[in-house]
Structure formats: structure tokens, C-alpha cells
């Protein structure tokens, strides 16, 4: 059987990435050009800065990915690209590059939802078993997704306000931590105790929705009031208390989803899936079903995950024409108008 190679492009936020996937789940390369240092001084991602950085490095990422994989453009079977959700300017850079490369090399173009990429990153670890439930946790999204079969995604719960990763970054900024703050909060939390009381919004309610704005506000108010009064705050305990509240909410809603849907596997993915506290709680508390979490290198934004999701769409011959456009607010159940079903 002839090997299949998919080149994938990811540029939805502040990482420029190009990867090569061989067949179903073998990543030959996954080149990532991070912009974290450029955005640190702003305390968050500046869309215009992100777009300019993508333009500067994306050609080199293509070259490096092919060289690292040891193949040439003539060996490729398809080109995949993230077309949403994300920052519109950033998405357009990746789309333009992917479309130009696909057109120049006479290759089909596969449109991929960024969040489907996060979910399908778990395929590199082991074959997924369906139906499954996915908890997707990142800086821009917090979602519970039911996946009855490959490529069929149904959101069954999502945040009503802040995403969990966004909450981490905002409380991190209040504490004077470096952006992005998730990893540092996790590390500090392991050294502290859950001594401050923070709300667990909607944790006992029957639905599968999340809310983190109240928790974020409670944290900011506590921190502000203590500073005003000159009270001492123990940073490690603050982080431990905040993280305990976050994990209580995530675990409660995930367990509720597992009790309602006929799942054979739980996938936990997205940037926040790198959180060691979350990984520990999941393995300790969810033992009746297999839990699959992507390796750390595939938790953040990367083109490897886009390639892994694209393999599913390739099998279904879900290709797009060159009118494919960026969809910054793309939902899981949306498909591009430019699909060409062969």
C-alpha cells in the first residue's frame, strides 16, 4: 500500500506551525514557531502582532517541516489547514499559505476545525474508541463534546463566559505572574493548600454548562481587598485554592456527561490539558472508563493535531476548493460552504 502524507498548517492564534503526517497517526515533523516572548510584555496575545509574526516565519516552517520529515512536495497526498475558530488575521495568513501551496502542487485542500484538531491530537497516542466524550480546555474554549463516530462532533456543554485558560491567565496577571500563567499557577498550586474559599459556579446544577467569570472575579476581589488592607497573601495557597475550584468544576461536569452519554472513552485535550493537577485528578477520580490525554507537546496549538484531524476528513474525501475562507467564530457543527464532496 502506498504511504499517505498530509501537510498541515496551524496559525489560529500565536503559534505558527507546519507538520507532516504519515498515514493515520505517525507524525514525521511538527515544526512550531512560538510567539510567546513577543506577547509577554502585553500580558496577552495582540492580534496584529500575531499576524505579522506568522507572515515572517510561515515559509520557513514549510521548508523545515518537509526537511525534517525527509520528503518533498511531490510525495504529499493533501494539504490541511485550520480555518477557524481563531484570530481572523492569523487564520488568513495560514489559509493563504496553505491554499497557495496546495494550488502550486496540485494537491487537495482539507479544511480543519481548530478544536477538532485538539480533540484528535489524542489519536497520536492510541486509536480512539467510539462513541467518546471529550473535554476540551484551552485559552479560548471550554467544551464537552460527544463524538459518536469519527468526525461527528456534538457540543453538549460549554462555557457561558470565560474559558478556563483565559481565567488562568487573568488571575495570573493579577498575581504578577508571567504570561501565559497556567503552568506557573499549576506548579505553585502543588506547593500550597486549598485555604481560600472560591465559588464553584453551577457545579450542582443539572446542565453541562460551565462558568468561570464568577470565580475569576472572586479571586480578583480577594486579591484587591487584601492589598488594600495590607493583609498578607500566600501565593502558593492562592494558586492551590483557585486551581481546586477550577478542577472541581471541570470534574463535576465531566462526570455528569459520562453518566448521561454512552461513551467508551474520555479524551481530555487543549492547552489546559497539560495541567498536571488536572491530569492527576482525572486519573484518580475517573477509573471506570479509559482516559486519553495527548502528550504535552500536542496539548498546545500545533499543526500535528490538525494533521491528525485531517486524516479523518481525508478518508471521507472532505476537500475544499480555493474559495475557502477564515471563520473566526467557527462552531463544531459548521462545515465550509466550499466543501467539494468527491
Swiss-Prot record:
**How is the cofactor bound, in the record's words?**
Binds 1 Fe(2+) ion per subunit.
Q: Where in the cell is it found?
A: Cytoplasm
Cofactor (UniProt): Fe(2+)
Q: Where does substrate bind?
A: 136-140, 169, 182, 186, 275
Gene3D superfamilies according to UniProt: 3.30.420.40
Single GO molecular function: iron ion binding
Q: Which GO terms describe its cellular component?
A: cytoplasm
Principal location = cytoplasm
Q: Does the keyword Ribonucleoprotein apply?
A: no
Q: Which InterPro entries does the protein's record reference?
A: ATPase_NBD, Gcp-like_dom, KAE1/TsaD, TsaD
> Any one Gene Ontology biological process term?
tRNA threonylcarbamoyladenosine modification
Q: List the CDD domains hit by this protein, alphabetically.
A: ASKHA_NBD_TsaD_bac
EC category = transferase
> Which key words are in the record?
Acyltransferase, Cytoplasm, Iron, Metal-binding, Transferase, tRNA processing
Q: Of which family is this protein a member?
A: Belongs to the KAE1 / TsaD family.
* Protein name according to UniProt: tRNA N6-adenosine threonylcarbamoyltransferase
What is the source species? Answer: Streptococcus pyogenes serotype M2 (strain MGAS10270)
